Amino acid sequence: MMQLRHGIFDESSISVIALDTVHEIGRLAGRSLDARRFRPNVVVRSLRSAPFQEDQWLGGVLSFGEADDAPAVTVTMRDIRCSMLNLDPDSATPAPEVMKAVVRANQNNAGIYGVVTRIGRLAVGQIVLLRAANEKRERG
């Protein structure tokens, strides 16, 4: 992860979505969805199986790894979706039922945006921890 002053992004420097959210939107739209359709920087597989759980992460900090100097993102806002998510990432075939499902299920929001608060390297399979913004990291 790195911090950019300028870049190509929608609202914030990092977008994150949970697989449970992708699967629920697919279920509601009546089709299997690829997470790439949502153009996230990070896809999270949560131990807590709940669609749209990212809404509860607002104001929190996602730490990528357990080290004290692990890369971190402060969650700043819900990801308001545009019609681009109707397009299949491989074929560009439109499926308007996808956007309709997001609107009906979660007020047109799917995933979150955040800002990088600690730079570092991310890896597939890495543990992601959520903590309150003012919570100190403690070793137990």
PLM regions: where:
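Metal-cofactor-dependent catalytic cores
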Residues: 1-140
